[in-house]
């Protein structure tokens, strides 16, 4: 297994936000996390690269293994972890730099100075993110001039440039129009050949289109985790059925 979470609990102060979540994720698959707002799915996603460490009064208990390594071990370098486990946020967040420098940024921060290598890596990353053909003639222009959908794909390229093996996406298309959303979904499908992807989404159609497995969270608990087709067509739990049929959420 690429990822193994065992009895994961998260507390924000006295608030018990995530309650004993256990699930395993295979390499080169897409896993969707669904559930109503505040159910714990984004909190669980942030556990994968220890982004919760940056939140005051947040405490994480349980084990999370990535490639067999306990990522909560004191010996784990969080900078290296976040390089290996990239993250794309809900709202596109390009830096106020050129398109080229947005992608090159992570390489430079990690000590890469070889100009030819950086040039090649920027092109490779933009191609991986299905953006190269749209920006190859304007790499020196500001990333802020791109459309919202292009900015989000640029953020994906920026994450890919440092060669992660896992890509976390927290509602990556929720702020985008339908055409841009379709491009992001197609990109997710293509990227899973090279990466293990975990995506938080409120859009159940998106979860069913893009993912191999789906986890349904409710009030901090993992209610059901199954193959996506099975979960959406023949859920085992009544709460899952009620949610996917729109009876609450």
Curated annotation (Swiss-Prot):
Keywords, in A-Z order: ATP-binding, Cell inner membrane, Cell membrane, Membrane, Nucleotide-binding, Phosphate transport, Translocase, Transport
Main EC class the enzyme belongs to: translocase
Gene Ontology CC, one term: plasma membrane
One MF term in the entry's GO annotations: ATP binding
Pfam families (alphabetical): ABC_tran
Xref: InterPro entries: AAA+_ATPase, ABC_transporter-like_ATP-bd, ABC_transporter-like_CS, P-loop_NTPase, PstB-like
Sequence ranges assigned to domain ABC transporter in this UniProt record: 3-244
Catalyzed reactions: phosphate(out) + ATP + H2O = ADP + 2 phosphate(in) + H(+)
Subcellular location, record wording: Cell inner membrane
Enzyme Commission number(s): 7.3.2.1
Listed GO biological process terms: phosphate ion transmembrane transport
Residues holding ATP: 35-42
Superkingdom of origin: Bacteria
Keyword Membrane assigned: yes
Membrane topology: Peripheral membrane protein
Main function: Part of the ABC transporter complex PstSACB involved in phosphate import. Responsible for energy coupling to the transport system.
Known partners and oligomeric status: The complex is composed of two ATP-binding proteins (PstB), two transmembrane proteins (PstC and PstA) and a solute-binding protein (PstS).
Family: Belongs to the ABC transporter superfamily. Phosphate importer (TC 3.A.1.7) family.
Official protein name in the record: Phosphate import ATP-binding protein PstB
Annotated source species: Cytophaga hutchinsonii (strain ATCC 33406 / DSM 1761 / CIP 103989 / NBRC 15051 / NCIMB 9469 / D465)
